[in-house]
UniProtKB/Swiss-Prot annotation:
Keywords for this protein: Isomerase
Entry protein name: Ribose-5-phosphate isomerase A
Gene (UniProt): rpiA
Regions that span the bilayer: none
Catalytic activity, EC: 5.3.1.6
A biological process term (GO) from this entry: pentose-phosphate shunt, non-oxidative branch
Amino acids binding substrate: T41, G42, S43, T44, D94, G95, A96, D97, K107, G108, G109, G110, K134
Enzyme class: isomerase
Length: 240
């Protein structure tokens, strides 16, 4: 991993929301004029979409990883293509719930992990945008999202228990609602705590082979190539 200094506007004591806007703006130079850009999901990506409005007439459009991002892109006048209409994307811009010093990530806090992984796989470069709190030594402190087919959820939870993890079915509107969250793909999400993921590649490969797992929120095979990190001294650029 190499690191480059910031070259983006910065002021001291920025809020987390301001840092998200800063890294969203910092991602714009990675967008090639005339291209179709891959766009992820989440609060930091929303700031990138807002910044992308300034160059909407210089790109051909976007491929989005969620219904929410599609609606936000269309609201500012950016054409959204279906992933099946595009063979390859130059760049994919998305956030992370955790990222380590090798560019491996945990993603899926916004429940869009499967589509995020699909769009990332179509892209030549993955640019992660995040604040410095997301940079970790070892993945696993953030609850690991796993998209599952509902009929397999209990069995998969037991498999995680055998690894030392505790899986909880994500609820729509919070745990008190009792109603399972349904993803854009019509599936459910397990959030798994108590894991230390020291071998992200091996872990992703292992869990993705369990029957009923749609995808696990470890992004090791689709790792970040660059991370723009909103830090106490501005934007740090990490290159993996």
């Amino acid at each position: 991993m190499s690191q480059k200094p910031t070259s983006h506007p910065y002021k001291p004591n920025m809020t987390q929301d301001e840092l998200k806007a800063l890294v969203g703006q910092a991602a714009l130079p990675y967008v090639e004029p005339g291209s179709i850009v891959g766009v992820g999901t989440g609060s930091t990506v929303n700031k990138f979409i807002d910044a992308l409005a300034t160059m909407k007439d210089r790109i051909a459009g976007a491929v989005s990883s969620s219904v929410a991002s599609t609606e936000r892109l269309q609201a500012i006048g950016i054409k959204v293509f279906d992933a099946t209409e595009v063979d390859e994307l130059a760049v994919y811009i998305d956030g992370a719930d955790e990222i380590d010093h090798a560019g491996y990530m945990i993603k899926g806090g916004g429940a869009a992990l499967t589509r995020e992984k699909i769009v990332a796989a179509q892209s030549r470069k993955f640019v992660c945008i995040a604040d410095e709190s997301k940079l970790v030594q070892t993945l696993g402190s953030f609850p690991l999202p796993v998209e599952v087919i509902p009929m397999a959820a209990r069995r998969i939870a037991r498999q995680f228990a055998a690894l030392g993890g505790t899986a909880t079915l994500r609820s729509k509107g919070g745990a008190e609602s009792g109603e399972p969250l349904v993803t854009d793909n019509g599936q459910h999400i397990l959030d798994v705590t108590g894991l230390k993921i020291t071998d992200p590649l091996g872990f992703e490969s292992q869990v993705n082979q369990w029957p009923g797992v749609v995808t696990v929120g470890v992004f090791a095979f689709q790792k970040a190539h660059v991370c723009l990190l909103g830090a106490s001294d501005g934007v740090r650029t990490l290159v993996f």
